[in-house]
Design a protein with these regions (language model features):
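Acidic (E/D-rich), amphipathic helical modules within compact regulatory domains
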Residues: 1-21
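Primarily a LysM-type cell-wall glycan-binding module
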Residues: 17-47, 67-69, 73
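Active-site/substrate-binding loop(s) of hydrolase catalytic cores
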Residues: 128, 142-146, 150-152, 156-289
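Short glycine- and acidic-rich boundary segments immediately preceding or forming the N-terminal edge
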Residues: 50, 72-115
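The alpha-helix within a helix-turn-helix
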Residues: 2, 41-42, 52
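Stable alpha-helical elements in mature extracytoplasmic
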Residues: 12, 36-37, 44-47, 62, ...
C-alpha cells in the first residue's frame, strides 16, 4: 500500500483522503429498486464496510434508484492476455491494465525504437538485489514478451493475494529485490514479424529488399534497420562483425559499429545506470525458452 501511494504521508492521513489499494478495482454499479447495501454486499460476497470505504459520500439508508456506487472487486485472475499475436500495441494495453490494478508498479521510458515506439521499463520491488529481465531482442522471438508479462502478472497476483508460486513466498522477494523488466526491446521488429511491413518509408521498401522481396517476415530477427540488436554491444563486437553478414538483413548483421541503434543504446545505458547484479534475457529457439 505504501508503494502504491508514494505521495502520501502515513503519519498525516486525514478523513476523506483517497488512497490506492493494490489488487482491487472499483466497478460502477447502479442501484436497483428495493436494493440495500447489505443485499449488494451479500450478492457480491464482500462486506458492507468495504462498499462504504469505496463510497465515503453515500448514505446507506437513503439509496436512490439509478444511483451509481463503486463496488470494490479483488483481482484474483490474470490481467495479461498472452495467448495471441502479441505486438507492441498488445504490450501497451497490458502494461496499462497492470498499472491500474497494481499501482505500486513503476513504469518509465528508457528510450525509443527507430520508429519512435517507447521502450518501457517496469520496476517491481524496492530491495537491494538488482535483477533484470528482458524479451524480444530478436523480433521473431516475440513470444518471450507475453511469457515475461504473464510471469509478472502471476508475481503480482501472488503479492496481493498472499499466495505462493510453486511453494515460494513472494513477499520476501519483493522486499529484497529490485526487479527491472523491459518486456519488448525490439518493438519495430516484432510488429514487422506479426503485422507485416509498415507503410512508412523508407522502412517498408528497405525491409522488403533485405528480405529478398518477400513480405513473409516470420524469420526476421533484426530491428527495422536490419541490425541484429543482440550483436550491437561493445563486447567482442569485432568477432561478430568478422563472422556475420556485412550488410543489413533479417539476422546476424551487427551494424557498422557497436551501439549505433537506439534500442541497443537504451539497453546499454539502462544496464550501466542500474548496475544490475543479474541479467536474464529471454530468448527462444527450437521450442525452448
Amino acid at each position: 500500500i505504501l508503494d502504491s501511494n508514494q505521495n502520501i504521508s502515513p503519519q498525516n492521513l486525514f478523513i476523506g483522503q483517497q488512497i490506492q489499494i493494490p489488487g482491487y478495482v472499483g466497478l460502477a454499479y447502479q442501484i436497483r429498486r428495493g436494493e440495500s447495501l447489505w443485499a449488494i454486499a451479500q450478492s457480491r460476497k464482500i462486506s458492507v464496510e468495504g462498499i462504504l470505504l469505496a463510497n465515503p459520500n453515500i448514505t446507506p439508508t437513503s439509496l436512490q434508484v439509478g444511483q451509481t456506487i463503486k463496488i470494490p472487486l479483488r483481482i484474483t485472475w490474470r490481467v495479461v492476455t498472452g495467448k495471441r499475436n502479441y505486438d507492441y500495441n498488445s504490450l501497451v494495453i497490458d502494461i496499462r491494465r497492470l498499472q491500474t490494478v497494481y499501482p505500486f508498479l513503476k513504469i518509465s521510458s528508457i528510450g525509443n525504437s527507430v520508429m519512435g515506439k517507447e521502450l518501457q521499463e517496469i520496476v517491481v520491488g524496492n530491495g537491494n538485489k538488482r535483477v533484470h529481465f528482458d524479451g524480444s531482442f530478436h523480433a521473431n522471438e516475440w513470444i518471450t514478451t507475453p511469457i515475461i508479462m504473464t510471469f509478472l502478472d502471476d508475481y503480482l497476483l501472488s503479492l496481493t493475494n498472499g499466495n505462493t508460486i510453486r511453494g515460494i513466498q513472494t513477499t520476501p522477494l519483493y522486499e529484497q529485490t529490485f526487479l527491472s523488466i523491459v518486456p519488448m526491446v525490439n518493438p519495430d521488429g516484432v510488429d514487422l514479424v506479426i503485422n507485416g511491413p509498415p507503410s512508412d518509408e523508407p522502412y517498408r521498401s528497405n525491409v522488403i529488399e533485405w528480405n529478398k522481396g518477400s513480405t513473409n517476415f516470420s524469420g526476421w530477427k533484426a530491428n527495422i534497420n536490419g541490425v541484429d540488436l543482440n550483436d550491437q554491444f561493445p563486447a567482442l563486437w569485432e568477432l561478430e562483425r568478422d563472422r556475420n553478414p556485412k550488410s543489413p538483413g533479417p539476422r546476424d548483421y551487427g551494424g557498422e559499429a557497436p551501439l549505433t541503434q537506439p534500442e541497443a543504446i537504451a539497453m546499454a545505458d539502462l544496464t550501466r545506470r542500474r548496475d544490475f547484479a543479474r541479467v536474464l534475457p529471454f530468448h527462444t529457439q527450437g521450442q525452448v525458452i
